[in-house]
């Protein structure tokens, strides 16, 4: 675990095999923030931004390669088919072939950049005796994380009055494999509210988040610990 003190609080980075858990603690104890990054990399770049530490996951090379391959494939299809002639007949315009290819490739490149998104980054912020805020960012691969958070972040706040409990629930997935996931029981809701629906932390990290969340939400039950073998 890597921990560092800032003027606004303490940031801890727990690097796991399949993900990275970032914990931001407010120096006054007003809130704590848990962010799960769906990549494991000890060479993160940390950028101090608006009272928090933004973690730059680095360039998603596999996503960029996918965008390039899609554009190359579309270019070959345009050259070997009568696609450009069909466009000329449809819109009754005559444009030089080179300009046609340039325009179409530009539009297709823009479309792939918009549609091919980076991995989801999920954050749970727990405010002292107030509630919890869930956020999810699935931004563009060419944008830095702080830009994606600004333009593509989806945020939901659940007040303390609506939260009945925070639990670690047991479930089954394909192949009858048992999984555990953090969820909030919300008043007047027929389903559990998953805290990390896309990125599933390990059971030990879930216990850590569970115990801290109950402390911040004024739950007095005994903290969870790893069962003895």
Swiss-Prot record:
Enzyme class: transferase
Membrane topology: Multi-pass membrane protein
Pathway info: Glycolipid biosynthesis; glycosylphosphatidylinositol-anchor biosynthesis
Highest rank taxon of the organism: Eukaryota
GO molecular function, one term: phosphatidylinositol N-acetylglucosaminyltransferase activity
Entry's transmembrane regions: 59-79, 101-121
Pfam families, per the entry: PIG-H
Enzyme Commission designation: 2.4.1.198
Main subcellular location of this protein, as a coarse class: membrane
Catalytic reaction(s) noted: a 1,2-diacyl-sn-glycero-3-phospho-(1D-myo-inositol) + UDP-N-acetyl-alpha-D-glucosamine = a 6-(N-acetyl-alpha-D-glucosaminyl)-1-(1,2-diacyl-sn-glycero-3-phospho)-1D-myo-inositol + UDP + H(+)
Subunit architecture: Component of the phosphatidylinositol N-acetylglucosaminyltransferase (GPI-GlcNAc transferase) complex composed of at least GPI1, GPI2, GPI3, GPI15, GPI19 and ERI1.
Family: Belongs to the PIGH family.
Function text: Part of the complex catalyzing the transfer of N-acetylglucosamine from UDP-N-acetylglucosamine to phosphatidylinositol, the first step of GPI biosynthesis.
Protein name: Phosphatidylinositol N-acetylglucosaminyltransferase subunit GPI15
